[in-house]
Curated annotation (Swiss-Prot):
Membrane side Cytoplasmic: residue ranges: 609-622, 674-697, 771-783, 846-877
GO biological process, one term: positive regulation of calcium ion import across plasma membrane
Positions contributing to L-glutamate binding: S154, A175, S176, T177, Y225, D307, K400
Family label: Belongs to the G-protein coupled receptor 3 family.
Main location: membrane
Function (record text): G-protein coupled receptor for glutamate. Ligand binding causes a conformation change that triggers signaling via guanine nucleotide-binding proteins (G proteins) and modulates the activity of down-stream effectors, such as adenylate cyclase. Signaling inhibits adenylate cyclase activity. Signaling stimulates TRPM1 channel activity and Ca(2+) uptake. Required for normal vision.
Domain of life: Eukaryota
Keywords, in A-Z order: Cell membrane, Cell projection, Congenital stationary night blindness, Disease variant, Disulfide bond, Endoplasmic reticulum, G-protein coupled receptor, Glycoprotein, Golgi apparatus, Membrane, Receptor, Sensory transduction, Signal, Transducer, Transmembrane, Transmembrane helix, Vision
Complexes and interactors: Homodimer. Interacts with GPR179. Interacts with photoreceptor synaptic protein LRIT1 (via its N-terminal extracellular domain).
Source organism per UniProt: Homo sapiens (Human)
Name the UniProt record assigns to this protein: Metabotropic glutamate receptor 6
């Protein structure tokens, strides 16, 4: 908010002596261009560079200084020559040199407020008197400045704006872009025809994102322009997301020797951040490029320069190879043909109003006008005055000329609108505009809208900012030569980015956009593990084992019946396997089973054929057929174990797995028990023991077997059989080897449970075989049964560790099934081989031995009771 008039009075009085001092100094220096007019505009231009120590001003700046100053003179000439714009009113000017220094510019700007200060105070108010009390002589009153065009650098504009606002003098800058100047509470009289760096920063963020970069460093010259620009870039990138700042480096205002080499070393601390965002002045840009070349990093950094770089050749002169690929941004502008015609016709004769033009002439044509000229080298030729710009020297219109012209026209249009409102129908100034109210003029300035010198609309928002419109350039080599290259337009930005990515060229592969990423993209089947505090950086973690990639941040385990795809980007069904007929694991047990069935069938057929022969009768025909049936079932169970699991097959497995062994061992147990009881009874009495008849033996055998049958039937009823697919059995470390196993719903323990009862019978039978090992030779089956049981026990003792020891194997289904069926077939083969193969051999090949023997052993006669009559007596033979 502006200060009230009373509050400003003491400040105005305090500034009065400074204004006098400034006037005196300016008069001595003759440091301004003056044009007479009814309304005077001020102008601030960096005609000279910053001076060395002890000097305010340095070398002449031909383009940024003289071109821009002449652009204002050109614009004033056009406005004053336009009968439709401010008719009867001539605009004058007072143009000052800021020498590219904010403090010096502030001293210069005090001349703009002299008229206002003089209007507020006089010699009586400040007590200034000459000897004798005579008032001092005062110079002619200065012209009243109604508005100021300038300054160039943001730091200069900020310094000047703080003074001009005190006196309500509107200010329009043609080049100051610092976001700080958008603060209308502090710089309420400041406007600009160039967009603020906040727009430029947004455009640069959009460029970075369009190139696919997410990890960049920033480089700023110390001061309002550089620091504010980087701050805006960082803030916008943080709000937009997806772009992280690796390094944020500030170049000191007065850099020490080796400072720029240090900057390059710091940038290389994060080598993946190849994109470098630069908000720096021309000199700093040049020295950064030089340091990059000295470090042999040509082509490593990907420069994105602000409008201070723009499309200028001076920052990259002789450094083109380092600048190849640099993307720069510049407020949308056009070359003004009328200014080119105007400036190229300027000469020493027709441009005496510009007090710096003679110095420009010497600098531009490398000559000297007088012995006191600025060109002090004795070898420099003398200027003839006939030199011509563009003919005898190179000429290219400076980039901000358009904006200087637009700034002048903005003030002219505002004054014209104000004149129409306050002086309707009046030619020339009316009393209502003498003096011109700065606050009212500011309102008219903010309301202007017209097509500028380049044909683009000129307007201001509530903060005095122009809309953001930028051209985007890239420095590209020509035919492989960087030195002969140039800036090529590759896009535009006006609230949204339009970038022709295909038109971009880069060192290395010209058409492949280089990367500036903290971390490379993760491959298929990998998730991002973010680095804490740096959202653009991550580590890639493989979704290993049975996990698959859900999204870029998450891995999850596949469902139990599935396994991941080879690249772990999804899940697929796990293949289902079973022990098939063609499996190598099924061949040995099937071969044994077939041979066993053939052998068993042969024995049974032989026994049936020779049913009434002594050997068959002596074997106990009834129990032999029961035992052979059990052996046959044992062999047959192999086919059930290999068959595809289903409800019927699973039920048959449960029922017959233990039935064959139970039937066999029940018969063997009954036989050994009968022999043992006969032998023991004979020791005590001649009376035979009970239940030794064939019928009794069958009853005992079937009674023992019925327990197994009843148990199995009860199990079938309690838990109906069905097949399942077990995905855990072959869930290997390598998912590619994982398989689902189709099998019956029987655990390892339940499988052994089916055989548990028969194993108990086997152990009991073995115990009786041991007890009966001392029976007389007349009981010719005692010893074969004993050998059978011993061997069977050994087989099953070997079976148990193999069966349970492979429980964790990937080949479990094959090993356990094969082990079980082979063990069953071997135990059946032992029984068949020990008990019946010898008898069959005698029956078939030695029939002469298949006769009833009459002799008895004397020992047997004297120690054993008489055996029962009939075929049981044959067992004694």
């Amino acid at each position: 908010m502006a200060r009230p008039r009373r509050a400003r009075e003491p400040l105005l009085v305090a500034l009065l002596p400074l204004a006098w001092l400034a006037q005196a100094g300016l008069a001595r220096a003759a440091g301004s261009v003056r044009l007479a007019g009814g309304l005077t505009l001020g102008g601030l231009f960096p005609v000279h560079a910053r001076g060395a120590a002890g000097r305010a001003c340095g070398q002449l700046k031909k383009e940024q200084g003289v071109h821009r100053l002449e652009a204002m003179l050109y614009a004033l000439d056009r406005v004053n020559a336009d009968p439709e714009l401010l008719p009867g009113v001539r605009l004058g000017a007072r143009l000052l040199d800021t020498c590219s220094r904010d403090t010096y510019a502030l001293e210069q700007a005090l001349s703009f407020v002299q008229a206002l200060i003089r209007g507020r105070g006089d010699g009586d108010e400040v007590g200034v008197r000459c000897p004798g009390g005579v008032p001092p002589l005062r110079p002619a009153p200065p012209e009243r400045v109604v508005a100021v065009v300038g300054a160039s650098a943001s730091s200069v504009s900020i310094m000047v704006a703080n003074v001009l606002r005190l006196f309500a003098i509107p200010q329009i800058s043609y080049a100051s872009t610092a976001p700080e100047l958008s603060d209308s509470t502090r710089y309420d009289f400041f406007s600009r025809v160039v967009p603020p760096d906040s727009y430029q920063a947004q455009a640069m963020v959009d460029i970075v994102r369009a190139l696919g970069w997410n990890y960049v460093s920033t480089l700023a010259s110390e001061g309002n322009y550089g620091e504010s620009g980087v701050e805006a870039f960082v803030q916008i990138s943080r709000e937009a997301g997806g772009v992280c700042i690796a390094q944020s480096i500030k170049i000191p205002r007065e850099p020490k020797p080796g400072e720029f080499s240090k900057v390059i070393r710091r940038l290389m601390e994060t080598p993946n951040a190849r994109g470098i965002i630069i908000f720096a002045n021309e000199d700093d840009i040049r020295r950064v490029l030089e340091a990059a070349r000295q470090a042999n990093l040509t082509g490593h950094f990907l420069w994105v320069g602000s409008d201070s770089w723009g499309a200028k050749t001076s920052p990259i002169l002789s450094l083109e190879d380092v600048a190849v690929g640099a993307i720069t941004i510049l407020p949308k502008r056009a070359s003004i043909d009328g200014f080119d015609q105007y400036f190229m016709t300027r000469s020493l004769e027709n441009n005496r109003r510009n007090i710096w033009f003679a110095e420009f002439w010497e600098e531009n044509f490398n000559c000297k006008l007088t012995s006191s000229g600025t060109q002090s080298d004795d070898s420099t030729r003398k200027c003839t005055g006939e030199e011509r710009i563009g003919r005898d020297s190179t000429y290219e219109q400076e980039g901000k000329v358009q904006f200087v012209i637009d700034a002048v026209y903005a003030i002219a249009h505002a004054l014209h609108s104000m004149h129409q409102a306050l002086c309707p129908g009046h030619t020339g100034l009316c009393p209502a505009m003498e003096p011109t109210d700065g606050r009212m003029l500011l309102q008219y300035i903010r309301a202007v809208r017209f097509n500028g010198s380049a044909g683009t609309p000129v307007m201001f928002n509530e903060n005095g900012d122009a809309p953001g419109r930028y051209d985007i350039f890239q420095y590209q080599a020509t035919n492989g030569s960087a030195s002969s290259g140039g800036y090529q337009a590759v896009g535009q930005w006006a609230e949204t980015l339009r970038l022709d990515v295909e038109a971009l060229q880069w060192s290395g592969d010209p058409h492949e956009v280089p990367s500036s990423l903290c971390s490379l993209p993760c491959g298929p089947g990998e998730r991002k593990k973010m680095v804490k505090g740096v959202p653009c950086c991550w580590h890639c973690e493989a979704c290993d084992g049975y996990r698959f990639q859900v999204d870029e941040f998450t891995c999850e385990a596949c469902p139990g019946d599935m396994r991941p795809t080879p690249n772990h980007t999804g899940c697929r069904p796990t293949p289902v396997v079973r022990l098939s007929w063609s499996s190598p694991w099924a061949a040995p047990p099937l071969l044994l089973a077939v041979l066993g069935i053939v052998a068993t069938t042969t024995v049974v057929a032989t026994f049936v054929r020779y049913n009434n022969t002594p050997i068959v009768r002596a074997s106990g025909r009834e129990l032999s057929y029961v035992l052979l049936t059990g052996i046959f079932l044992i062999y047959a169970i192999t086919f059930l174990m290999v068959a595809e699991p289903g409800a019927a097959v699973c039920a048959a497995r449960r029922l017959f797995l233990g039935l064959g062994t139970t039937l066999s061992y029940s018969a063997l147990l009954t036989k050994t028990n009968r022999i043992y009881r006969i032998f023991e009874q004979g020791k005590r009495s001649v009376t035979p023991p009970p239940f030794i008849s064939p019928t009794s033996q069958l009853v005992i055998t079937f009674s023992l077997t019925s327990l197994q049958v009843v148990g199995m039937i009860a199990w079938l009823g309690a838990r109906p059989p069905h097949s399942v697919i077990d995905y855990e059995e072959q869930r290997t470390v390598d998912p590619e080897q994982a398989r689902g196993v189709l099998k019956c719903d029987m655990s390892d323990l339940s499988l052994i449970g089916c055989l548990g009862y028969s194993l108990l019978l086997m152990v009991t039978c073995t115990v009786y075989a041991i007890k009966a090992r001392g029976v007389p030779e007349t009981f010719n089956e005692a010893k074969p049964i004993g050998f059978t049981m011993y061997t069977t026990c050994i087989i099953w003792l070997a079976f148990v560790p193999i069966f349970f020891g492979t429980a964790q194997s990937a080949e479990k289904i094959y090993i356990q099934t094969t082990t079980l069926t082979v063990s069953l077939s071997l135990s059946a083969s032992v029984s068949l081989g020990m008990l019946y193969v010898p008898k069959t051999y005698v029956i078939l090949f030695h029939p002469e031995q298949n006769v009833q023997k009459r002799k008895r052993s004397l020992k047997a006669t004297s120690t054993v009771a008489a055996p029962p009559k009939g075929e049981d007596a044959e067992a004694h033979k």
